C-alpha cells in the first residue's frame, strides 16, 4: 500500500527527520530526539506536522442534527468559533474514534469541521453520508483532508511565538475556540487546541502554503514520538491503543471520557450508554507508575500483588518530565483509584507499581 504523504514531507526530509507509518501516512517520528523535542514543548515551544489528522466539513440546514446523531457531546451548544471534544461511537456505545468538533466562525462556507484520527477520514465521511441518507437529512459532507495542512505549535512560549506571526488576537481566543486569520500572511484557521497539555494552537492552512507557516514558527520541530510521550503524561487517549472497535472495544465511560456523553441529546448510542452510566462500567482506564525499574508497554499484564491478573497496559513510556515509568491501563473499577499497589509484568517479571490519577502532570 502506498503511504500518504503530508504536504511538508520535503521539508522534513531536508531536516533529516526519521519517518514511520502511522495510520497509512508516512510521518516524521523524530527530528533530533524524542527527549529533546519533548523537553522543548514542556519548557519553551515545539511545532508538529499533524496533517495526518482528518478534516471533514458538514454544511447545510441539517448539519447540526447530523453531527449530533454521530457524536456524544452536545454540538447544539456551540456558537460560531467554538469547539468541543467528544467521542464517535457505534450503536452499542463502543468508541470508533474521538474527535474535536468545531463550529466554524461566521462567514465560513461550512458550518462544522470535525477532526477524526489518522486514517479514519474515509470511514468517518462514509459514516456521516450513510446516516444522512438513511434519515433523509439535508447536509453536505466533504472530506477535506487533502485540502488542508495542519500544524500544531505547543508550549509555554507558543502564544508569544504565534502572536508575532498572526493578525488574530490570541489573548481573545480561549481554549477550544477557533478564529479565521492570517499566519505569516497565509489565510488560516487558528484553534486554541492541542494534544500536549501545554498552551498551544492548531493551524489549518492550504497545503501549498504550509511551508511558509512552518518556517515562520521558529521553534523546535517535533515528531510523533514526542507527541506520544507528551499526550501520555497528560493521560490523553490514542486511537488504536486506549480504544479500538475490535482489539480494544471500550465505551467512553470505560475510557475516562464519560463527561463528553450528553444523554439528553439524540445520538445513536444514547440508549446503550444510559445503561452504562446508570450501572457504572466494569473496568476503567487508570494511570500507573512503576516503582521498580522497567518500562511498561502496550499489552503487558497488570496483576494484584499476589499475581492475580486484573488488567493490561494500553500505553506506556519512560516519562521524560517525571523521570519515571508511566502507563495507562484498564483494570476493574474497584482498582481504578489512586495509590493502589499493583504489579506490571515486564518481560515475564512482575514489577512493583501503583495506580495514579491522570494527568500525571499538574497542568
UniProtKB/Swiss-Prot annotation:
GO terms for cellular component: glycine cleavage complex. The keyword Secreted does not apply. It comes from the Archaea. It catalyses: N(6)-[(R)-S(8)-aminomethyldihydrolipoyl]-L-lysyl-[protein] + (6S)-5,6,7,8-tetrahydrofolate = N(6)-[(R)-dihydrolipoyl]-L-lysyl-[protein] + (6R)-5,10-methylene-5,6,7,8-tetrahydrofolate + NH4(+). One of its GO terms (molecular function) is transaminase activity. GO terms for biological process: glycine decarboxylation via glycine cleavage system. Signal peptide: none annotated. It is an enzyme of class 2 (transferase). Gene3D superfamilies: Aminomethyltransferase beta-barrel domains (3.30.70.1400), Aminomethyltransferase fragment (4.10.1250.10), Probable tRNA modification gtpase trme, domain 1 (3.30.1360.120). Its EC number is 2.1.2.10. The keyword Transferase applies. InterPro entries: GCS_T, GCS_T_bac, GCST_C, GCV_T_N, GcvT/YgfZ/DmdA, GcvT/YgfZ_C, TrmE/GcvT_dom1. Keywords: Aminotransferase, Transferase. The glycine cleavage system is composed of four proteins: P, T, L and H. Belongs to the GcvT family. The glycine cleavage system catalyzes the degradation of glycine. This is Probable aminomethyltransferase. The gene is gcvT.
